[in-house]
From Swiss-Prot:
GO terms for cellular component: host cell endoplasmic reticulum membrane; membrane; virion membrane. The chain crosses the membrane at residues 39-59. It comes from African swine fever virus (isolate Tick/Malawi/Lil 20-1/1983) (ASFV). Glycans are attached at residues 12, 61, 97. This is Minor capsid protein p17. Together with the penton and the other minor capsid proteins (M1249L, p49), forms a complicated network immediately below the outer capsid shell, stabilizing the whole capsid. Three copies of p17 encircle each p72 capsomer in the inner capsid shell, anchoring p72 capsomers on the inner membrane. Required for the assembly of the capsid and icosahedral morphogenesis. Additionally, inhibits the host cGAS-STING pathway through its interaction with STING1 and subsequent interference of the recruitment of downstream components TBK1 and IKBKE. One of its GO terms (biological process) is symbiont-mediated suppression of host innate immune response.
Length: 117
């Protein structure tokens, strides 16, 4: 009696073993019966995987290029950045318009007022 055709003997195998053998048998049977169709299907699957990888690489490179090639603002344009979080009180923070950051050059009128006073 053949073990593949006997339902009682194949039932004694574990379920996983039985499914594995049935799947392998079906796949081998299909490949042996239709080698051309199987080759075409495998070729299509391989091409799809290659195309998917290429699309993923191009998409990733495009997103990286978009981030790195953002137009730079002119130097006179100031970007407000959020201040970093410090653990000391607010009054110790640097002021944005402090005299150390901006050089204040007095005009001639202001110099004349200082001389007269």
């Amino acid at each position: 009696m053949d073990t593949e055709t006997s339902p009682l003997l194949s039932h004694n195998l574990s379920t996983r073993e039985g499914i594995k053998q049935n799947t392998q048998g079906l796949l081998a049977h299909t490949i042996a019966r239709h080698p051309g169709i199987t080759a075409i299907i495998l070729g299509i699957l391989i091409l799809l995987v290659i195309i998917l990888i290429i699309v993923a690489i191009v998409y990733y490179n495009r997103s990286v290029d978009c981030k790195s090639n953002m137009p730079r603002p002119p130097p006179s344009y100031s970007i407000q950045q959020s201040e970093p979080h410090h653990h000391f009180p607010v009054f110790f923070r640097k002021r944005k318009n402090s005299t150390s950051q901006q050089a204040h050059i007095p005009s001639d009128e202001q110099l004349a007022e200082l001389v007269h006073s």
